[in-house]
Regions:
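An N-terminal structural lobe/cap that precedes and organizes the functional/catalytic core
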Residues: 1-97, 169-201
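Short coil/turn segments at secondary-structure boundaries
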Residues: 19-20, 98-102, 161-165
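Active-site-proximal alpha-helical scaffolds that flank and shape metal-associated catalytic sites
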Residues: 68-133
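An amphipathic alpha-helical core segment
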Residues: 105-193
Length: 201
């Protein structure tokens, strides 16, 4: 999943947020990852990030969404679906969180910037770009989604083709939205189970 879904599933727990944003930057076993300022709750956030991604990759609704894109985008379909689901979430944010999206996203940015010194330098460019560009709120608009896809295409050569995928979000919005509605409650249950397991352990 992409950033907004991930942050939603960390609740309002700053340490989980910080760990989650590290999820794509930490390779190998989480318990062996060391960095000054890293807490056990942040490690849990890294593992939560991995749990979200692993569950998402296998969910039938996500697989259906990928099949819409697969004839054109092949293995890149998953990356595009992740971004499209952030759009669905942002468009219908009030259904999922009591705080308005602009207030929520500014709170996330403040948390990340305030704790930048506790995070590895490799993640700093992502956080700075995300907050300066207001990516999370931008996902609510078609323009913001197109900008996100084009940015990914520029930053990651392997994803060079996805910059043109935005029109399919409009064309198939109702189908992506229905798949998201089926998927998100199941993902929330899995995240709750994971966090309960960590608390018991």
């Amino acid at each position: 999943m992409n950033h907004l879904v991930h942050f939603l599933l960390t609740g309002d727990d700053d340490e989980l947020r910080l760990g989650d944003v590290l999820g794509d930057f930490v390779k190998g076993r989480v318990e062996r990852f060391e960095h000054h300022g890293l807490t056990e709750r942040m490690r849990t956030g890294i593992q939560l990030h991995r749990t979200i991604d692993a569950f998402s990759d296998r969910h039938p609704a996500v697989l259906r969404s990928k099949r819409i894109l697969a004839p054109v985008y092949g293995r890149l379909s998953g990356v595009i679906v992740d971004v499209f689901y952030d759009h669905v979430l942002a468009r219908r944010w009030a259904e999922h969180h009591p705080r308005p999206l602009p207030d929520y996203t500014q709170d996330v940015y403040r948390t990340l910037r305030r704790n930048l010194h506790r995070l590895p330098p490799a993640v700093h460019p992502l956080i700075n770009a995300m907050s300066l560009g207001d990516w999370l709120r931008g996902y609510s608009s078609q323009h913001g989604i197109e900008r996100a896809l084009q940015g990914m295409a520029q930053r990651r050569p392997v994803a060079a083709g996805i910059g043109t995928a935005g029109h399919l979000l409009i064309e198939h919005f109702e189908r992506f939205s229905a798949d998201f509605d089926e998927f998100l409650p199941d993902l929330k249950v899995r995240c709750d189970e994971f966090l309960a397991e960590r608390a018991d352990g």
